[in-house]
């Protein structure tokens, strides 16, 4: 809303609203739709169905995809969406535009993408028999980022196969080719940022039975700056940042500046290959972590643009508000909006 008021928003963009929707959120969607914005709420469950099924504006609905993939965060039970049978039993919508689903994150096999797309297309064609406005398939996110600099399969080839599948299945059913939405945010924005640290101390590892020979201590914290390192064991490509590529290499572990023993990074194969360096204040070593633009310090506690909660202090029978819950304006300012 603020971006619209400031005339900094492209009104030709389509906004897809995923996730749970409070009454306040639903009212905002309605307000923006009445102002002419192309806002499409994705119906995630029965409560939202009551609010949007007969809307005169475009809506989408989520399929609870039974085709599973080998990927991160692939859950056997998904709390979002409706099964195929539930969708096909629904009375027709007034303006159903989008069928949405997702199968996981950072999926590993192209065949999983195609299998889920084919299943979703069959549901799409069945739904379209009663909902003639349906024209878009949203295959969600999950395209993996080659964090380790190993490109497992080219994205253009995957897209070619998806387009070929959409074309062939559509023509087989005598239906116009659907529009395609991909929510590959991580894949798009991760390469847009690198994170550089200065080595502020080194320490030899004298214990036997480990491959690493040195600790390198950085002037930052993985738990603050690259939180996926600690939270999900994310691996990164790491290199010296200040032209020390001719130096002899050593096997290192990298430690953050916090006092937490979990604030470490031990590399893809158990070590990080870095220039063999002993701390020298007059000859600093800087190292760079690549592809850090998705979900790290850029989002931190604002994943999915959620605001930080109200903070209160309860002491001796008194309750004091230490910090109010962040407003949408506060969150926007964090991103320079």
Q: Which sequence ranges carry the predicted segments?
A:
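Generic beta-strand/beta-sheet core signal
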Residues: 18, 44, 62, 102, ...
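Short glycine-/acidic-enriched loop or helix-start segments at secondary-structure transitions
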Residues: 26-27, 52-53, 148-149, 191-192, ...
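Conserved active-site and cofactor/substrate-binding residues in soluble primary-metabolism enzymes
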Residues: 47, 82-85, 111, 115-118, ...
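Short glycine/threonine-rich loop-to-helix capping motif typified by GTGT followed
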Residues: 109-115, 146-158, 189-201, 268-269
